[in-house]
Amino acid sequence: MIDLHTHSVLSDGELLPAELARRAYVAGYKALAITDHVDSGNLALVLAQLIKVSKDLNKYMKIKILPGVEITHVPPQQIPELAGLARKLGAKIIVVHGESPVEPVISGTNSAGLESDIDILAHPGLITEKEIKLAKKRGIYLELSARRGHSLTNGYVAKLARKFG
């Protein structure tokens, strides 16, 4: 089992990265990406901390830790720049916080994310058929979330993903 979208105390999570990794390992996970929320103000700082702790934990633990980011609530036009910077700085997993139906995410975020160098579009809400096809073409994964609210469109996203991909 793996989880490629988790948060630590570096954003809105409750655990230090080491405790998050330990708990995941005990629960049977083989790999864990820590993808804390970032924007232009904290991307470099958060990612540097996650890269350091991931390197340290990978020396001593039997679970693979991947440093990453979740680009969150930024203007869609800024997503390509931030994704490129995150990749350049060493992010192994780049997530974009999609247009969830329960948060005021800016319209156009899904499309901008799918046009950028990202790995996962998280909780994409009422994603369009065109966007689903673009995700398939670019090899970008779409997240189905267990989180309350974000999960409201899981059935819709899964149905379209099956239809087109």
Locate predicted features.
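Short, conserved loop/helix-junction motifs that constitute active-site signature segments
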Residues: A135-K136, A161-F164
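Short acidic/histidine-rich active-site segments
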Residues: H37, F164-G165
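Histidine-centered catalytic micro-motifs
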Residues: M1-S11, I34-H37, P124
